[in-house]
């Protein structure tokens, strides 16, 4: 029976905007009613201010990175760590923090984020492509990040994938154009699995799961 994941798993739902993260988070809330749901930036006053500045303000990328990092450290200490024995499902994590911090050296960003944040046991990355992204962006008003263009967003997607691998996180990559119910079942099957989720021991490990690659066989 689905929706009964074992305690003590930290799952990050990742992907650039328009990939359906919010839809999956809403569906997961219905499935895992006792889980702790959270997001980055965090939902407190500080996190809300940072989110608004990132989407609509004119701060430099480096300044935004430092603010996000401070929020991530506080979020980890006050919410993630104290609830380590629960199923935690987060809309974004340090993976996005590293991926969007393009003004910082990649390895430096990895080191800093490792120092202040908990590493997810599982990263679910909802992936898009140029055609899908172009169509979905045309249907909405774009914020500061989305206004940087399709090429930039696809570069961020590649950095999300690279960040998860470099952090040694087991990763489930799913094409975002699959039916939302199918995506949900794929995610739940992985959350409910009895195996240890953190299987990738190094950046060279090939053990990260990919629904995309399995589907192509």
Question: Model regions: which residues?
Answer:
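P-loop (Walker A) phosphate-binding loop of NTP-binding proteins
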Residues: 16
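Hydrophobic anchor at the beta1->P-loop junction of P-loop NTPases
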Residues: 13
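NTP-dependent small-molecule kinase module
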Residues: 2-5, 131-217
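A glycine- and Lys/Arg-enriched "phosphate-lid" helix/loop adjacent to the NTP-binding pocket
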Residues: 97-158
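Hydrophobic positions on the alpha1 helix immediately C-terminal to the Walker A/P-loop
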Residues: 24
